[in-house]
Design a protein with these regions (language model features):
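Sec-dependent bacterial lipoprotein signal peptides
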Residues: 1-19
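Hydrophobic membrane-targeting alpha-helices
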Residues: 16-20, 24, 80
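Internal amphipathic alpha-helical segments of the cytochrome P450 catalytic fold
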Residues: 18, 53-54, 133
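Short, low-complexity N-terminal intrinsically disordered segments enriched in polar/charged residues
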Residues: 21-50
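Short hydrophobic/aromatic segments of transmembrane alpha-helices and their interfaces
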Residues: 38, 56, 115-117
Length: 141
């Protein structure tokens, strides 16, 4: 189960890397509001840092729930938080649009750079155009 969640996160990260564009340069899909994407992304970051793995899992859309569990989310985040330390504050944030090449599905992502006690973490929280949580990525920097 952990491997499936890691694959989902790796696929999401690959989408960013394969897009060939600067992450901050892509407009959100039509109908998506940057403020809403950021607000929802901040809620997920707060839940992740508060240890509410079940709530994060329950917000994932059905296809993402098939490859994740509260335990895989917990394991994923604890590994990163051990390196970065406790959350301190948000440093920078923006919303960007992306597209899954294989399916053509457009989605919006909240990108939040946050300071922690030891290191910073860049959070990417992806939402469908219906504002369903598609996936998360947390990269220690």
């Amino acid at each position: 189960m952990r491997k499936k969640f890691a694959l989902l996160l790796a696929a999401l990260a690959a989408l960013f890397l394969l897009s060939g564009c600067k992450v901050s340069g892509n407009p959100l899909p039509e109908g998506m509001e940057g403020d809403t994407v950021l607000e929802q992304g901040r809620e997920i970051v707060a839940l992740l840092n508060g240890g509410d793995w079940q709530e994060v899992y329950s917000r994932l859309r059905a296809d993402a729930q098939e490859t994740a569990s509260p335990e895989t989310i917990q394991s994923y985040m604890e590994e990163r938080l051990e390196k970065a330390g406790a959350y301190k504050e948000e440093d920078e944030a923006f919303a960007t649009g992306q597209k899954i090449k294989e399916t053509g599905e457009e989605y919006g992502t909240a990108v939040l750079y946050c300071k922690h006690e030891k290191k910073s973490i860049m959070y990417r929280v992806a939402y469908s155009t219906d504002m369903e949580l598609m996936g998360i990525e947390a990269r220690v920097r």
